[in-house]
A protein has these predicted regions:
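A feature for the membrane-embedded catalytic helix bundles of lipid/isoprenoid biosynthetic enzymes
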Residues: 2-9, 13, 21, 38, ...
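Short, hydrophobic transmembrane alpha-helix segments
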Residues: 21-30
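Cytoplasmic membrane-interface "Motif A"-like loop-to-helix N-cap segments
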Residues: 59-61
Length: 195
């Protein structure tokens, strides 16, 4: 029972990998793309569920927080890589997510050595703006919602709703903007861990 949140994280990451492999092999199969839409929503809902279970059952831990973020990053990069490989999005978006992820997660690793976490009471963020952009429920929730919609909707746009491609690309660019704007404070405030 104590590992339930982590098992959910493993399951959702495995689902993302599985559906991405299937879509990669059948990128024009309307039925598969429609399934991918629903499976992506399931992956995203499970991301919220693991945290809720950890809090409700008092199973929160530093490792659990790290593992959740790692699975989030893996899942995010799986979908963005898939979209870039299929040329559904510009390749530079994948580069942005990779570079941001490596830099931010690297700094968070150094912060973790000093007992700081990405979110919560032990957050590494000191400034109010930095905390708001990276750790506030509003920013985490709105970024999560934008990711959920843009990542899942991409499959519908390429199956039954091509008329919404411009809207989908707007959402992808908005998601990328959020990715960058939430990473900048970590880069700025994280410098203190290298002194």
């Amino acid at each position: 029972m104590s590992q339930l949140p982590n098992l959910i994280s493993i399951f959702r990451t495995t689902l993302a990998i599985g559906i991405s492999i299937i879509v990669l092999r059948n990128p024009e199969n309307e039925k598969i793309l429609n399934y991918a839409f629903w499976i992506t929503w399931t992956v995203i809902l499970l991301d919220g569920l693991d945290g809720i279970i950890a809090r409700k059952l008092k199973l929160e831990s530093d490792f659990g927080a790290f593992f959740d973020i790692a699975c989030d990053r893996i899942t995010e990069l799986i979908f963005i890589s898939l979209f870039a490989i299929l040329r559904w999005i510009p390749f530079w978006i994948l580069i942005v997510f990779l570079v941001r992820g490596i830099l931010v997660d690297g700094i968070r690793g150094f912060a973790g050595k000093e007992g700081k976490t990405a979110f919560g009471k032990k957050s590494m963020m000191k400034s109010k703006l930095g905390y708001f952009l990276t750790s506030s429920r509003f920013m985490r929730g709105s970024y999560g919602a934008i990711k959920a919609i843009s990542l899942s909707f991409m499959f519908l746009v390429h199956s039954t709703m091509p008329q919404f491609l411009n809207l989908e690309m707007f959402l992808i660019y908005l998601m990328t903007f959020y990715c960058v704007i939430r990473g900048v404070p970590v880069l700025i405030e994280g410098r203190r861990f290298f002194n």
